């Protein structure tokens, strides 16, 4: 069983990244429950190396897709995502959304004919993952219309991933005295979630 971890924990805190701590809590519990899982990680460095698609790149990718050349390197991220049995995405809550590097990654995995396709009744997902978990943290409290959460929920529908779950560690910069307790609570939620999947 292949577990894909998309690590977009870009942070000035380095190893003290709060989003990464949330991810560690989830992954530890998940791997304890599923010791057979093969963990594959897309690192922050790999994400930052991805280029956003310009017109030339889009035309090249479309030409490759039409010829069925999905083994080309431009589809590497999409193939990896499509073949994962479970996906964890971790990214901080930046500017009411998430880091730009994650949006570029989404461009790379959104490949018609590989991660989804069209039929007369609309779009159908082609990814084999049964669930995707989105982990995020932010200085502000969670809002009902948090873009990161909404976007990944919609992407799961696009990719045919039936179950979407998330943990939002929020309010971390409101009162520094409360931050440790808030993080502890969020990590406990992530741990508990992993035990149910």
Question: Would you name each region that the model predicts?
Answer:
Residues 27, 31, 110, 114, ...:
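Hydrophobic/aromatic-lined pockets within catalytic cores
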Residues 106-121:
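Conserved nucleotide-sugar donor-interacting segment of glycosyltransferase catalytic cores
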Residues 8, 44, 136-137, 169:
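Cofactor-binding loop segments of dinucleotide-utilizing enzymes, especially the Rossmann-like FAD-
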Residues 118-161:
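Short, glycine-/small-residue-rich phosphate/pyrophosphate-handling segment
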Residues 143-197:
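Glycine-rich phosphate/pyrophosphate-binding loop and the adjoining helix
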